Curated annotation (Swiss-Prot):
Family: Belongs to the ATPase B chain family.
Example of a GO cellular component annotation carried by this entry: proton-transporting ATP synthase complex
Name of this protein: ATP synthase subunit b
Membrane protein topology class: Single-pass membrane protein
Underlying gene: atpF
Disulfide bond annotation, renumbered to this chain: none
Residue intervals passing through the bilayer: 7-27
One Pfam assignment: ATP-synt_B
Function per UniProt: F(1)F(0) ATP synthase produces ATP from ADP in the presence of a proton or sodium gradient. F-type ATPases consist of two structural domains, F(1) containing the extramembraneous catalytic core and F(0) containing the membrane proton channel, linked together by a central stalk and a peripheral stalk. During catalysis, ATP synthesis in the catalytic domain of F(1) is coupled via a rotary mechanism of the central stalk subunits to proton translocation.
Protein keywords: ATP synthesis, Cell inner membrane, Cell membrane, CF(0), Hydrogen ion transport, Ion transport, Membrane, Transmembrane, Transmembrane helix, Transport
Tagged with keyword Oxidoreductase: no
Classification via HAMAP family: ATP_synth_b_bprime (MF_01398)
InterPro entries xref list: ATP_synth_B-like_membr_sf, ATP_synth_b/b'su_bac/chlpt, ATP_synth_F0_bsu_bac, ATP_synthase_B_chain
Length: 156
């Protein structure tokens, strides 16, 4: 094997190039690769964090929707209860008004019956007196006549 100076010079140049590369070229490349891997890791963690936040936001939205549905159903149920209560109150008022009208009608009818009886008693007493007058063909004393009428009214 013939080793000449060119080969030896090439080896020295190669070693200088290797040392120069390791000293000046390799560290920026390593730093660039490290920064790139750090950016990728940060991006992945940010994506995971965003995904977790999105899931949390979806859960909050679902909870708020469920709460809104429950509130809506509760309001509808309350409105139905109020409607039933108002209907019952109106029904009770109508029944009370009907009972009052019936009681008033009964009282009016009773009053008319009493009035008719009084009128009838007076007419019956007058007819009885007239009949007695015609039978006796004479007029009865006014005081006696009033006493007889009152007595007949009381009996009827």
């Amino acid at each position: 094997m013939n080793l000449n100076a060119t080969l030896f010079a090439q080896m020295v140049v190669f070693l200088i190039l290797a040392w120069f590369t390791m000293k000046f070229v390799w560290p920026p490349l390593i730093n660039a690769l490290d920064e790139r891997s750090k950016k990728i890791a940060d991006g992945l963690s940010a994506a995971e964090k965003g995904k977790a936040e999105l899931e949390a936001a979806h859960k909050r939205v679902d909870q708020e929707l469920a709460q809104a549905r429950n509130d809506g159903q509760q309001r509808v149920a309350d409105a139905e209860k109020r409607a039933v209560a108002v209907a019952d109150e109106i029904k009770a008022q109508a029944q009370a008004e009907a009972a009052r009208i019936i009681a008033q009608a009964k009282a009016d009818a009773e009053q008319q019956v009493v009035k008719a009886r009084e009128t009838l008693r007076g007419e019956v007493a007058a007819l009885a007196v007239k009949g007695a007058e015609q039978i006796l063909k004479r007029e009865v004393d006014q005081a006696a006549h009033a006493d007889l009428l009152n007595q007949l009214k009381a009996e009827l």
